[in-house]
Curated annotation (Swiss-Prot):
Recorded coiled-coil stretches: none
Gene3D superfamilies (UniProt xref): Ribosomal protein L22/L17
PROSITE patterns: RIBOSOMAL_L22 (PS00464)
Annotated HAMAP family: Ribosomal_uL22_B
A cellular component term, taken from the record's GO annotations: cytosolic large ribosomal subunit
Name of the featured protein: Large ribosomal subunit protein uL22
InterPro entries: Ribosomal_uL22 (IPR001063), Ribosomal_uL22_bac/chlpt-type (IPR005727), Ribosomal_uL22_bac/org-type (IPR047867), Ribosomal_uL22_CS (IPR018260), Ribosomal_uL22_sf (IPR036394)
Protein biosynthesis keyword on record: no
Amino acid sequence: MSTVTEFPSATAKARYVRVSATKARRVIDLVRGKSVEEALDILRWAPQAASEPVAKVIASAAANAQNNEGLDPSTLVVATVYADEGPTAKRIRPRAQGRAFRIRKRTSHITVIVESRPPKQKGASAASARSRRAQGSKAAATKKSAETKEGSE
């Protein structure tokens, strides 16, 4: 799968990781779109066992971006991250009365693409959005009070 990005990027892959793809995806969804530092911090405290290999791949992608592409590590964002299923190793578990159950040891391929994005001024935009909302609610409140005064007269 080739992914074209609008920002400078770097890729890292971990193949044949001994964790199922569904369990890896559970952890991956926590960090998609976050900055690399924030993603590694989230994974450091995540209780899931899959967080360790995912964190290693993100750290490797960040190192690739810094060493191979010459990108600033403070501007890196986890742009694309996904886990595909790898081959499944099959084992036999002996059970009672001569039966045998199959154990599936699932593997996955984890891919991470980090991009160097310019920092956003989210503090100013969030404050302006709050002020717009507050102005709208104030206008609605004054309009409602004016209507109730007209109705009582």
